[in-house]
Amino acid sequence: MTNITSVNTLVSASKLTCIREERILFDELSFDINAGDIIQIEGPNGAGKTSLLRILAGLSRPYAGQTFYLNEDINRCRDEYNEDLLYLGHLAGVKSELTAEENLNFNLRISGYDDFDTAAILAKVNLAGFEEALAGHLSAGQHRRTALARLWHNDCKVWILDEPFTAIDKKGVEELEQLFIQHADNGGCVILTTHQDMGIIKDDRLRKIRLDYRFV
């Protein structure tokens, strides 16, 4: 992973424009996301929050504008960026036919990790005793925690998370917030969407980007 101890700005957006079905979701949106930042993307349903996250992750192309990682266009440093990026969409990305342990093992190995204790990691998300349970038999909250477990064994600098608190109880949300703070304090950044209020991450620590769409 990239050593960024001397680099402050991790991800930058320059004049990003996104248009969907004759609606301008956002227009010439520019901002810098620095090491230590926790960023919440806000806006009504349909405002383009998920679209913006996907553009920042390099999974979708904007109508106009550019996204940069360490001041280089992500299209020119794709491999380096992907190594330092963890993206979790609003869908859990968990295979129902695999156990919780198998899902975590799969997700960590495809991310390049080979030295980890799946049982210990699952215990951190309150899934101790459910290691061998098929994901398809888990509750919605357990399903989501299975997806989120990889955050507890990850050294990517950039975390992009779409609705990470969905189906998570209050205690679980607080544990995630603490993890986000720890990740930011260690020089990473967290970019997320959520419809829930956060209790631990206060406004003086949280930066917000507001989206409001309009018709062309």
Curated annotation (Swiss-Prot):
SUPFAM superfamilies: P-loop containing nucleoside triphosphate hydrolases. The keyword Cell membrane applies. It comes from the Bacteria. GO terms for molecular function: ABC-type heme transporter activity; ATP binding; ATP hydrolysis activity. It is a peripheral membrane protein. One of its GO terms (cellular component) is plasma membrane. ATP binds at residues 43-50. Residues 11-216 form the ABC transporter domain. Its EC number is 7.6.2.5. Its main location: membrane. GO terms for biological process: cytochrome complex assembly. InterPro entries: AAA+_ATPase, ABC_transporter-like_ATP-bd, ABC_transptr_haem_export_CcmA, P-loop_NTPase. It catalyses: heme b(in) + ATP + H2O = heme b(out) + ADP + phosphate + H(+). It is found in: Cell inner membrane. Keywords: ATP-binding, Cell inner membrane, Cell membrane, Cytochrome c-type biogenesis, Membrane, Nucleotide-binding, Translocase, Transport. Part of the ABC transporter complex CcmAB involved in the biogenesis of c-type cytochromes; once thought to export heme, this seems not to be the case, but its exact role is uncertain. Responsible for energy coupling to the transport system. The complex is composed of two ATP-binding proteins (CcmA) and two transmembrane proteins (CcmB). Belongs to the ABC transporter superfamily. CcmA exporter (TC 3.A.1.107) family. This is Cytochrome c biogenesis ATP-binding export protein CcmA. It comes from Shewanella sp. (strain MR-4).
